C-alpha cells in the first residue's frame, strides 16, 4: 500500500478529469493542493498518465481543489487494475460548488527545533474578490493562556508556530479563525482550527513503586502467579509505540536452586513462577531486578526491585523428641497432668503448619486420658480424663500421634510416641452402695427402733475396718451404729414438720471412714420417705368470731388437718359443754368448713364455745372458739359498735383547762422571781476570790455568789509563762502530755500518765500568783490574815499531810514542815 501525494496524485486527478471531459459538454479544470489533506490510496506502482493500474480507493468525502472555485468531488469507489482510465468512470459525479471556509486538522510534532516562527497552514476566504480580507485567530494558545504559541499573518492568513510544543502538557489546541473586511465586518463564520501535537519518545517509563513486594507458597507448581509490577510512560501509547512499555527480569538473587525461578509477562508485568523447587527452609526470599522499556522493548529503560517472600507450606512433619515416655499417676485423680510430649517442626513457628495437633490412637480403651496442645510451647499435655483404678489396672500403654493444624502440602509420614503410664495405689475412701439410698419409714416410730442398715465397701485390696457416723441430721431424729451401720430412731419422726421435711422426705448424710493411713471418708445420702399416721386432729381457723345477736349471719371457719388422706377430710363437728344451747355448728358439703350461728338471742358480750372436730380417721380435736356477740343486725365486720356518751367529754375538757391554767401561773411566778445577776468583780479588778463574812454566827457559813467566768478555765487557757508579782519564779519545763491512743485497751495507761503529768505541770491552776483580797473596812477584827490562828503555837499543828499533796504544795510543806528556812 502506498500513499500518493504531490505529483503522482496530481497525475491521477488529471486522468479522471480527462475522462470527465469526454462525457460532459462543459469543460472542467482540476487542480490539487497537497496541504488540503486529500489522501489517495492506490495498489500498484505503474502510474502512467493513460492508464490507472491497481485498485484506487478515494478516502474521505471527496477531493477539494482550490484553483478557481470549481470543485470535482469523487465518492468512495474503486478502479479495477489493468483497465483504461477512459473506461473506468467514478461511481458518481457531483455538480461543482463553491469552496467552503474549512480547514482539516493540522498535525505538528512535539519538540520541534524550528526555525521559529514556523508556517503551519494558510487561511483563505473565497470572498476576497474586490475587497481586502484581514485574518485573526482566538483561543487557548493564541489570545488566552498559554498566549503567544500561535499567531496569524493578518493579510496573508498564514498560521505561525512560535515555540516547540509538548504533547505531555497539551495534546490538542482548538483555535478559531476569523475573516473580516476592511470596514471590520465579518465575511465568514468563525472557522475551527484543530492543531494536534504528535508524540515523540521523550519520556522514560517510571515504576509506580521503587520496591514491589509479593509472596508465594513454597513448593507451588510452575505458572503460579506471584505479583504484578506496574510502570507508566507519559508518551503516546495509542497512536505510537513511544508509550508502550515492555517488562523483563534483569537479575535474580539468590540464584538458587537456579537463576531462572521466575518470569514476567512482557505486557502486563505479572511475575510468575517458572521453575519448581521453591523451598522456604533453604531460600526464604528472592530479590528480582525488573526492567520497564518503552517502544515495546526497544526504547528507554528503567528498573525497580521486586521482593518475593516464600511463604511456608506444611512440607515438614513434626517429630517427637523423645519418642518414648514413662509416667506415674496416683489413682482416682481427675485432670492430673500425666506427661508433656515435645515435638520439633521446621516450619515457621506459631503458624498453622507448625502448631501441633495430638491424638491418642491406641491404648486408651476406657477413655481415661485426653491430650491437648499447649498454646505457647506447642507441647502435648497428657492428662487424666477419668480417675484411674489401681485395683483394676495398674499400667496403661498409650500411643500418641502428632500432625499439624494445616494439612500436609505433600505426602509426609506421621510421627508416633509411646507413653507408659504407671498407676500408684492410694488409700481410697469407702463407697456406699448405693450412694443415695431411698427407704420408707413411718412417722412416730419408737425411739431405738431400727430404720435401716446402710453400709459402705472399701475398694482397696487391704482389709480395713470401716466406722460409721452421721454428719447431717437436722432434727436429730436418727442414730447409727459405728460398726454395723444400723440406723435407728433417736427422736420422734414427724412428717408434718415442715422445717425439716420437704415433700415427705427427710434427708440424712452418713459418713464411712476406713482405718487407713491417712484415713479416708466416703459419704452416702439416706432419703427417708415418711409415711403418714393419724397424729393430728382438725383445727378451725380463725378461732375468734364476731356476730350480731339480731338476724345474725353465720360465721364460716376453715378446717385444716396436717395429716394426709384418709386421715383428713371429710370432717365432722359438734358443740360440747352446753355450747349447743345457744349455738349451732354445721359442716359444709365438701367437709372442709364449718359454719357457726346463734340459735337464741344473747346480749352483747364475749362467749367461749367448745367446738369438737373429728377427721375421717375419727381423731377428735377440741378447740375453744372466742365469740363476740354485738347488739346489731345482720353482719358485723370489725368490732361491736359502741354508743357515744357525751357526759365523759365535759369533765375531760375541764381537767385539761385546769392543767393549762396551773402551768401558766407557775410560769409567771418563775419569771417574777428571776433576778439579773450582777458581775461579782469589776473588769479592772482581776481577782479570783470569794468574800466570807466570818462574824455571822447565826445561820452558819454562807457562800456568796460569784461569777465563775472570772475563774481560770482549765487546761485550755493555761498561760505559757506564770509570773509572780513579788518573787521571780524558777522556770520548770512543761511536761509532755501523751496523745489519746487509738487502741481502746491503752486508755487506762493514757489516763494515769497524763494525770501524773498534770500534777507536775507548773502552768496548771491554781496559779502561783499574788492574789489581792477585798478590803473589808476599818475596825476589822482581824487586821491581817496572819492573825487568824487556830492555836497558840505551830507546834500544836501537824503539817505532815502537806507532803502528800504533791509537787504543787511542796513549797508550803517545806515552810510548815521545817524543810526550808524562813
Curated annotation (Swiss-Prot):
Q: Hey, what's the signal peptide range on this chain?
A: 1-25
Quote the subunit structure annotation: Interacts with CDCP1 and CTNNB1.
Cross-referenced Pfam families? CADH_Y-type_LIR (PF01049), Cadherin (PF00028)
Task performed by this protein:
Cadherins are calcium-dependent cell adhesion proteins. They preferentially interact with themselves in a homophilic manner in connecting cells; cadherins may thus contribute to the sorting of heterogeneous cell types.
Q: What GO terms fall under cellular component here?
A: adherens junction; plasma membrane
| One function term, GO molecular function aspect | calcium ion binding
The name of this protein is Cadherin-3
The upper taxonomy is:
Eukaryota, Metazoa, Chordata, Craniata, Vertebrata
Q: Which Gene3D superfamilies match?
A: Cadherins (2.60.40.60), TCF3-CBD (Catenin binding domain) (4.10.900.10)
Gene name tied to this protein? Cdh3
Q: Which loops or segments lie on the Extracellular side of the membrane, by the record?
A: 100-647
Ranges of the Cytoplasmic topological domain: 671-822
Amino acid at each position: 500500500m502506498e500513499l500518493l501525494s504531490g505529483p503522482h496524485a496530481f497525475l491521477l486527478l488529471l486522468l479522471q478529469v480527462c475522462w470527465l471531459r469526454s462525457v460532459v459538454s462543459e469543460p472542467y479544470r482540476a487542480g490539487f493542493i497537497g496541504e488540503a489533506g486529500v489522501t489517495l490510496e492506490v495498489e500498484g506502482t505503474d502510474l502512467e498518465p493513460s492508464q490507472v493500474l491497481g485498485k484506487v480507493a478515494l478516502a474521505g468525502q471527496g477531493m477539494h481543489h482550490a484553483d478557481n472555485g470549481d470543485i470535482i468531488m469523487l465518492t468512495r469507489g474503486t478502479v479495477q487494475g489493468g483497465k483504461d482510465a477512459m473506461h473506468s468512470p467514478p461511481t458518481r459525479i457531483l455538480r461543482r460548488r463553491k469552496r467552503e471556509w474549512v480547514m482539516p486538522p493540522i498535525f505538528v510534532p512535539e519538540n520541534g527545533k524550528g526555525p521559529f516562527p514556523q508556517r503551519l497552514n494558510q487561511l483563505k476566504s473565497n470572498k476576497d474578490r474586490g475587497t481586502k480580507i484581514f485574518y485573526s485567530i482566538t483561543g487557548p494558545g493564541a489570545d488566552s493562556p498559554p498566549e503567544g504559541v500561535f499567531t496569524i499573518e493578518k493579510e496573508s492568513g498564514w498560521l505561525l508556530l512560535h515555540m516547540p510544543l509538548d504533547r505531555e502538557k497539551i495534546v490538542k489546541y482548538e483555535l478559531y479563525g476569523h475573516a473580516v473586511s476592511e470596514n471590520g465586518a465579518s465575511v465568514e463564520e468563525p472557522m475551527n482550527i484543530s492543531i494536534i501535537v504528535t508524540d515523540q519518545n521523550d519520556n522514560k517509563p517510571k515504576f509506580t513503586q521503587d520496591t514491589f513486594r509479593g509472596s508465594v507458597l513454597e513448593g507451588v507448581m510452575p505458572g503460579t502467579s506471584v505479583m504484578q509490577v506496574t510502570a507508566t510512560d507519559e508518551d503516546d501509547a495509542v497512536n505510537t509505540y513511544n508509550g508502550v512499555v515492555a517488562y523483563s527480569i534483569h537479575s535474580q538473587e539468590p540464584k538458587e536452586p537456579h537463576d531462572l525461578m521466575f518470569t514476567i509477562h512482557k505486557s502486563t508485568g505479572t511475575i510468575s513462577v517458572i521453575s519448581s523447587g521453591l523451598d522456604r527452609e533453604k531460600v526464604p526470599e528472592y530479590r528480582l531486578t525488573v526492567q520497564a522499556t518503552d517502544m515495546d522493548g526497544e526504547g528507554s529503560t528503567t528498573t525497580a526491585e521486586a521482593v518475593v517472600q516464600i511463604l511456608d507450606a506444611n512440607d515438614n512433619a513434626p517429630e517427637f523428641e523423645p519418642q518414648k515416655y514413662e509416667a506415674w499417676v496416683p489413682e482416682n485423680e481427675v485432670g492430673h497432668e500425666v506427661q508433656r510430649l515435645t515435638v520439633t517442626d521446621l516450619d515457621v513457628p506459631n503458624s498453622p503448619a507448625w502448631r501441633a495437633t495430638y491424638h491418642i490412637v491406641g491404648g486408651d480403651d476406657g477413655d481415661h486420658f485426653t491430650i491437648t496442645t499447649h498454646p505457647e510451647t506447642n507441647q502435648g499435655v497428657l492428662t487424666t480424663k477419668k480417675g484411674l483404678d489401681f485395683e483394676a489396672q495398674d499400667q496403661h500403654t498409650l500411643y500418641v500421634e502428632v500432625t499439624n493444624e494445616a494439612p500436609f502440602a505433600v505426602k509426609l509420614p506421621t510421627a508416633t510416641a509411646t507413653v507408659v503410664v504407671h498407676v500408684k495405689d492410694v488409700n481410697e475412701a469407702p463407697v456406699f452402695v448405693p450412694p443415695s439410698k431411698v427407704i420408707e419409714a413411718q412417722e412416730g416410730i419408737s425411739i431405738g427402733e431400727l430404720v435401716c442398715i446402710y453400709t459402705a465397701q472399701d475398694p482397696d485390696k487391704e482389709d480395713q475396718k470401716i466406722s460409721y457416723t452421721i454428719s447431717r441430721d437436722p432434727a436429730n431424729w436418727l442414730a447409727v451404729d459405728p460398726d454395723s451401720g444400723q440406723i435407728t430412731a433417736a427422736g420422734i419422726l414427724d412428717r408434718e414438720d415442715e422445717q425439716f421435711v420437704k415433700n415427705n422426705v427427710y434427708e440424712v448424710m452418713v459418713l464411712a471412714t476406713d482405718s487407713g493411713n491417712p484415713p479416708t471418708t466416703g459419704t452416702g445420702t439416706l432419703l427417708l420417705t415418711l409415711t403418714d399416721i393419724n397424729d393430728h386432729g382438725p383445727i378451725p381457723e380463725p378461732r375468734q368470731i364476731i356476730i350480731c345477736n339480731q338476724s345474725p349471719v353465720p360465721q364460716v371457719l376453715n378446717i385444716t388437718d396436717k395429716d394426709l388422706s384418709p386421715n383428713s377430710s371429710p370432717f365432722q363437728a359438734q358443740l360440747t359443754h352446753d355450747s349447743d344451747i345457744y349455738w349451732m355448728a354445721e359442716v359444709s358439703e365438701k367437709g372442709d368448713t364449718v359454719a357457726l350461728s346463734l340459735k337464741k338471742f344473747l346480749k352483747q358480750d364475749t362467749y367461749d364455745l367448745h367446738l369438737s372436730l373429728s377427721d375421717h380417721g375419727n381423731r377428735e380435736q377440741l378447740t375453744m372458739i372466742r365469740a363476740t356477740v354485738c347488739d346489731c343486725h345482720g353482719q358485723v365486720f370489725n368490732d361491736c359498735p359502741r354508743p357515744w356518751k357525751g357526759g365523759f367529754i365535759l369533765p375531760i375538757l375541764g381537767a385539761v383547762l385546769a392543767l393549762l391554767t396551773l402551768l401558766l401561773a407557775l410560769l409567771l411566778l418563775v419569771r417574777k422571781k428571776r433576778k439579773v445577776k450582777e458581775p461579782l468583780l469589776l473588769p479592772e479588778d482581776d481577782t479570783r476570790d470569794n468574800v466570807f463574812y466570818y462574824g455571822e454566827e447565826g445561820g452558819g457559813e454562807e457562800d456568796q455568789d460569784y461569777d465563775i467566768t472570772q475563774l481560770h478555765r482549765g487546761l485550755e487557757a493555761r498561760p505559757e509563762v506564770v509570773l509572780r508579782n513579788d518573787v521571780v519564779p524558777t522556770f520548770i519545763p512543761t511536761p509532755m502530755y501523751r496523745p489519746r491512743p487509738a487502741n481502746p485497751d491503752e486508755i487506762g495507761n493514757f489516763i494515769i500518765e497524763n494525770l501524773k503529768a498534770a500534777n507536775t505541770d507548773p502552768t496548771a491552776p491554781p496559779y502561783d500568783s499574788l492574789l489581792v483580797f477585798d478590803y473589808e473596812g476599818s475596825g476589822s477584827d482581824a487586821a491581817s490574815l496572819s492573825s487568824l490562828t487556830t492555836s497558840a503555837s505551830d507546834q500544836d499543828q501537824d503539817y505532815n499531810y502537806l507532803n502528800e499533796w504533791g509537787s504543787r504544795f511542796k513549797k508550803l510543806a517545806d515552810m510548815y514542815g521545817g524543810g526550808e528556812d524562813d
